[in-house]
Each structure stands twice: as C-alpha cells, then as structure tokens.
Amino acid sequence: MKILFVTFSIALLGALAVFSQTGNSPLAGFWQGAVEKDGRIWRVNLTIEKTGASFKALADFPDADGYGREFSVGQTGETFRLERPQPSGVPIVFEGAPRGDVFKGSWSGFGQTATFNLKRAAPPEKFYREREVAFKNGDVTLAGTLIAPLKGGKFGAVVITHGATPNERAGYRSWALHFARKGIAALVYDKRGAGRSTGETRAASMEDLARDAVAGVEFLKLQPEIESRRIGVAGHSQGGWIAPLASVMSKSVAFVIASAASGVSPDRQSIYHRANLMREDGFSEETIKLASDLRARLYATGRMLLENDPRAARERRRISAELEKYKDAPWLDAAALPPNLDNDNPPRGALELLFFEPAPMWEKMRVPVLLVWGDKDKVVPVEEGKTIILKALKKGANPDVTVKVFPNVDHGVTIVGTDKTWDFPRVDLNYYDAIVNWTVSKLKNQKI
C-alpha cells in the first residue's frame, strides 16, 4: 500500500507539472511530429506557451533548416489556427483541435494542402545560450544575438553577415545553431536599416557592410567567452562579398566562409539572376535579351551618375521613354524594370555597391577560406564565378583554399528534385555540415 501511494504521488506530481507547463491550455506545450502529403514527410516541432489569454507559438522545420519561426495563434471553439505569413502572400497554416497528447488537423502552404499529426513530447535538452547584444560602426548601431555553446569556456566564433535586401538576424539563426552544436559561438545581427539596427540599407556600400562585420569581430574580441584570435566571418550570397572584404580590411579576421558567392560584380550578377527568373516564367530568349539589354543600359546610367557624367540624366529619360512603350507588355513585371526613372537616382552607396568588383579583393586575401556552392544555383553564375575567384586567390598566393560544390542544390541550399513530383522544401544539411566541420578543423589549427 505504501508503494502504491508513493507511485500515485509521483504520477500526480508529474501530471501537475505537465498541467503547469501547458498553462492550463490543451494547446500549450512541446509538440513533435510531421506534415504528410502523398507519403512525403516534413518534420515539425511546435513550442507553444500561453500567458494570460495570449499564445506564443514557435515552429521548427528541421528538413528545411528553419528554427524558431513565429506563428500567430487564433482559436474558434476547440479549434486552433496557427498562421505565418509568407512573401508569396499565401500563409502557412496549421488548423486542428488538440485531444490529450495528440494535435492533428489540416495544413496548407506553398500552394499545397496536407495533414499534420503531432504528439506531445518532452522538450529537447538545450545545447546553447544566447544574449541580446549591440555594437557600433561609427554612427550606426547594430543589434544582434550572441549564440554560444551551453557548456565550456573560451570559444572560437563566427560573425555571420547578410544577403542582399534588409535582412534581420532571424534568417541566420539556424546557421548559428549549427555552429553552437559543434562548440563554436556565432554572432547574428540585424543588417543596418533592418530590425533594431539603425542606418539605411539602400545607402550602404559594400565597404560599409564589411565594416559592420569588422565591428562585430571587434565586439566579439572583448567578450569573456570568446577566444579573441579565433574569430572568422561567414556570409551567404551578398555575404559572400562582405565576408572576404572584411578579412581584407581587418587582420582580426582569422578565416572566411563564402557561401554562394558571386565572382562577378553585383550588376552582372543581377542581370544573370533576372534572366534565369524570366526563363522559369517561360519567356522567350528574344524577350529575355530585350529585358537584359534594358537592365544593362539602366545600370550603365548608374555608372554615369557615380562618375558625375552629365549624360546620365538624358540617357535615363531615353530609357524611361522606351519603358513607357512596353508598359503593357506581359514581360515587364517579370523583368522587374522600373516604369519611370524620373527623380529616382540611387544613393551613392548603392551605386558603389552595384559596381563592386570582387576579384581585387580575393587577390588580397591571406586567411584560410572555404568556398561553397550548389551546382543548381541560378542566382549567381557558379562556374564563371568560381573560375574568377580561384584565379584571383592563386594570383594572391593564398595557401589555404577549400572548395566544395554540392550537386542538386540551389542558391537557398534547397535540394532540387531530379523528377517533376512536388515535395516539401528540403535543405541539404550536408552543406552546413561541411561548413561547420571545416570551421572546427581550422579552429584546431594553432596558427590562426
């Protein structure tokens, strides 16, 4: 009888603990399972907290390498609707009614419908710590998060830079977590002009953005948990220009990771990318050439503006007149050309960024560098860019260069299917494993 009473007491305490953790709501807690469509599984973890009458829902999608994605929560009767907006305008939605330890229902996203089935589970053991930080580059204040392994002392570290457009730190959180799992700290921050960072994105030159990354390195050098001589800079896409430029600017950068980097200038890369988007939309090569030529002429006026060439205004008016002729053309929106250029001169920093030539920078690099691409990248010209970068590194006699190209991987590190059947977005996690393992090997080298 005594044993029975003790067993009952332990069970009651466990039930009370679960009741407390779930905030007296059938939805709150940690849920683990998957979305399923036509036999294809897409793993999902949900962490849902209730405070008062409101919920906070965070979703992890391990197959897409997406972590901590915030969802809004609505309730109608016993049915809950979790929703997250998407750039396409069509949100990702979970809708269902939890029953005890099971939460299942309908799912929609990416233009598809499916079902989801989740079970209540114990939350995974946390392997990292994080804290909000801020650092300065001149008049610009950059807000970020320092993510470090939960256990241990001095860590090597990586400053993670951004792609194009005003990016916030959340988009790089999963990359930071990959590093933390292997004992490396990472600083992610809101790009200038985004999130809680001050400054203006559009007015920034490539040098401005690289100096922001260097400021992050200098900040990390002062942190007690960071080994000051073992700090590198990593970047994806536009970050593949920023990271190596930061290493040329500062001897404090111990190594560089350039993912999906373009070996050609941003203006040429933009023309290449837009042409590929138009091909995907089914436009003819003749139409694509017309749009590409217009874009090249538009960029040429930008160079004129940068050089204070008085012919710039006249040429921009001429291009505006041509664009007016095509205002009803079905390809104009796909070409992403402005309908009118009057009074729309870009700031000088944006023009300097547009015509940034990367080869001289690579020639000056002296630190270990990892170059990683996916061979199905349609945003940057991989083979052309790889040739340019490696030639420049050879000219500069950089002794420590590693190159990896992953098959069937696109610019977003998403696996490109070899057949035509639909699948959930899946990231090639081997891509990130290669990056982290290379970093671990370099940090073991006493010379950096």
Q: Where are each of the predicted segments found?
A:
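The serine-hydrolase catalytic nucleophile loop
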Residues: 165-177, 191
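Conserved alpha/beta-hydrolase
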Residues: 179-196
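Accessory cap/linker subdomain of secreted extracellular hydrolases
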Residues: 257-364, 397
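Short beta-strand element of the alpha/beta-hydrolase
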Residues: 154-163
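Short beta-strand/loop motif that positions the catalytic acidic residue
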Residues: 365, 371-373, 377
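N-terminal cap/lid segment of alpha/beta-hydrolase-fold proteins
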Residues: 119-152
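Central antiparallel beta-sheet cores of small beta-barrel/beta-sandwich binding domains
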Residues: 21-99, 106-108, 112, 142-145, ...
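Alpha/beta-hydrolase active-site loop
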Residues: 204-224
